[in-house]
Amino acid sequence: MRSFFLYANFDSMTNYRNLDADEIARLSAQFCQAEDWSKIRVAEGFTTANISHARFSGDITLGVFEKDILLPGGLKKKAGLHHVMLHNCTVGNNTLIENIPNYIANYNIGRDCYIQNVNLMLTEGESTFGNNTDVSVLNETGGREVPIYNRLSAQLAYIIAMYRHRPDLTERLRTMIREYSSALKSNRAHIGNGVYIINTGTIRNVCIGDRCRIDGASRLDNGTVNSNAEAPVYIGPNVTAEDFIISSGAYVSDGVVMSRCFIGQACHLAHLFSAHDSLFFSNCQGENGEACAILAGPYTVTMHKSSLLIAGMFSFLNAGSGSNQSNHMYKLGPIHQGVVERGSKTTSDSYILWPAKIGAFSLIMGRHVNHPDTSGMPFSYLIEHGSKSYLVPGANLKSVGTIRDAQKWPRRDKRKDPNKLDCINFNLLSPYTIQKMLQGINTLQGLKKTSGETSETYSFQSTTIKNHSLEKGINLYTLAVHKFMGNSIIKRLEGGAFADIDDLHRRMKPTDCLGQGEWIDLLGLIVPKQAVSNEIEHIVSTPGYTLEETEAFFRDMHKRYYDMEWTWVCDVMPRWYGKTYEQLTPEDIIGIVKKWNESVVALDRMLYDDARKEFSMVSRIGFGVDGSTEQRDFDFEQVRGEFESDAFVKMVCKHIEDKTALGNELIERLKSLANRM
């Protein structure tokens, strides 16, 4: 496996020749110098017309310089070399390099590039250009290092960082990455085709892919920018980066400072954001704040000043202003870590003292210092009140914000590269979250039984649950499980009429052998734990196993998700419905669909009521500043619109209608089958 651009800059079929005496004379007359003219080779068709004030040393290969380069503002410049010193360089056709205060050394530069006012650009010694750099995620003192490389995915990073209980696996994966990186080792860096670099400080030991634009960066040291024509990378003013890899489609600008970082596809870092020892995967956004030793899965977003993400694993996170965590208890150093599972939010000024583990799709409000573990209670509120951490199980299931997040994530996938590195499952309800709800129902019922139904509060994993919150949590989780199970059954039974009961059961028969048991979230990829365990054994027991095979495994799991999900649903049916899929009658399924419809409508009604709060009288405070009550209401409606015409509200209403119709259609087909039995 090789970096995609390193060997694509120059046409191997091009014939190169030495300069003739007349060309040397003309170049000398144009204020050019060479340490040894015989070491300069040029392409057929080369002319000296567009080269002036250039100095050459070492082995030099030049293309032809005959086309105009169109610059922003409509300015045209002829390709060529002006006021530059080149040492051991290859320059492709129709590239313009000018006004280089120091020099360019040991670089292969592609065609159609524009390099202007770059202080210094060189390759020093042999380099792997950021590949195989160890990044100390989660534990600042080490122990979970992930070696980065050009094609690192969120899924592979998760396994390397989190599966330290399998040292044989860790060492095997590290060896593969080390071998991959060794194959890239070179004493010459490469710049792809159509690259634009201006007004930049020092670039040292950095490979840059096609169509990259670097404008005003301060210093880039030991890295790779995996830009390509489909998904160019932009690096803007005052960026300082060392020991890094930046993936396709990324945007890094406005004073970003980073060290030992991997920046995933379509990530956006700007506005003085700083990061060290951190991995950011697809569509992450970081502005104004700081990240230290984090494993940031897809869609981790921190946009505000005074926000610090440290020593944690996150994905689909929305961090509020002033959110931070502590990994240091001033005893043995910054050795603690935390996990915030997918889809969570932190409110302004929230704080968590690590270690802690927060359940999926949770809302974190206030300060939490007692190390809560709420991973068994997804979709919950974790709220500080009177120095205690209160847990409200399932409350986020009825939050309009949760549903909006699920809708916007796919729309905000900015990856343009056809070769996507990360596998991302956007589903809110999945075997991963539903299994936790099933466990949550049992846990809450167990708390009620153990402590008594009349208890005002219950203790759970360093949190407090109020009595009414416990009851509501059981109800919300039950509705969500009915919704998910019904969704899966209805989807499975789509299509025409059923010939007979055997035909019904044939359609319900699982088609994938994987899916039973526990499911896990590999930073975006939702997958059965058994499948990962099987692949781990394959990795450690197969001498010729490659990184390409890990990529193929993750893609295969992603592709098979819905088939494996159905296997899981069938496995859960006896526990939830009291029957296997083979024992279900048409009447049973009709009852399931009716219960599903009731659950969907009930949850949608809650979302509807939650959305209505945004149109309450309280929400109108600040509108109609200088007017009457009527003017206030009119001002509000002009800005926010009316409740019934709100896009989300209309979506909820239509969702109720569509789901009801979908359920009724299946019920009619099942009734037809029942009448024929």
Over which residues does each language-model region extend?
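Short, positively charged and aromatic/hydrophobic N-terminal segments
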Residues: S3-S12
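Long, structured ligand/cofactor-binding scaffold of large enzymes
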Residues: H83, N88-V91, A183, T200
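Glycine-rich hexapeptide-repeat left-handed beta-helix
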Residues: S12, A29-A34, V42-F65, I69-L81, ...
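Membrane-permeabilization and membrane-interfacing ectodomains
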Residues: R178-S186
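Long, charge-dense tracts
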Residues: N102-Y103, Y107-Y114, N119-F129, T133-V135, ...
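Long, compositionally biased intrinsically disordered regions
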Residues: N117, H385-M677
